[in-house]
Design a protein with these regions (language model features):
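Hydrophobic ligand-binding cavity/cleft-lining segments
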Residues: 1-53
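Short loop segments at secondary-structure junctions
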Residues: 23-25, 77, 105-108
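Glycine-rich portal/gate segments that line the openings of hydrophobic small-molecule binding cavities
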Residues: 39-43, 49-97, 109-110, 116, ...
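Beta-strand/loop substructures that line and gate deep hydrophobic ligand-binding cavities in soluble
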Residues: 89-156, 163, 172
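Charge-rich (especially acidic), low-complexity segments
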Residues: 171-181
């Protein structure tokens, strides 16, 4: 037994966060299934605009200066899975996959609401940019430089998602705002 463990021994190839959200699962799923919701609850993704390719969105990731991020959301309503397929700098190979699932809390916790499970896998591209020619030349960081902070960062984002959904639900507002409809 040790008093301190290296990040890799604790988290390894996966980063998983989860939380209870006091919001009906179908409403939370519908909100999350819209790619533009990421602009509200993530730390750094802003300015989503559709691309010429149906279902593919372009935004700016403020973690990297002048960084474009491409996102396609693959959602399954019946299973309530929402997977965000993303990549910095180019939209042809979306290799950063954010796997999310919204579970009916009544089934697993015997109370109304949702449980959100979120997992990222440490893709080899986190270690080295596979498309350096697409990167802005002045950018000093690569998304993989932040891997050790994914757990803390994603938990913060999940807490933001929770706060938004719970506030809207508690106040009788649509969880998915009108501007997204």
């Amino acid at each position: 037994m040790r008093s301190v463990y290296p990040h890799d021994q604790v988290f390894g190839e996966y980063c998983t966060v989860n939380d209870y959200v006091d919001c009906p699962p179908d409403e939370l799923y519908e909100y999350m299934a819209d790619t533009r919701s990421l602009e509200e609850w993530t730390y750094s993704l802003r300015g989503f605009t559709p691309t010429d390719e149906p279902g593919l969105w372009l935004a700016h990731d403020r973690l990297g200066s002048e960084t474009k991020i491409y996102t396609r959301t693959i959602a399954n309503e019946q299973a309530r899975t929402v997977d965000y397929h993303c990549a910095w700098d180019q939209g042809k190979h979306l290799w950063m996959i954010y796997l999310m699932r919204v579970i009916d809390a009544q089934v697993v916790l015997d109370k109304p609401g949702s449980v959100v499970l979120w997992t990222n896998c440490h893709h080899p591209f986190y270690d080295e940019n596979p498309y350096p020619e697409s990167a802005p030349p002045q950018r000093p960081v690569w998304v993989g430089d932040f891997w050790d902070m994914f757990g803390a960062g994603h938990l913060l984002e999940l807490k933001t998602l929770k706060a938004i959904a719970e506030y809207r639900h508690r106040n009788g507002l649509p969880v998915t705002p009108k501007w997204m409809r």
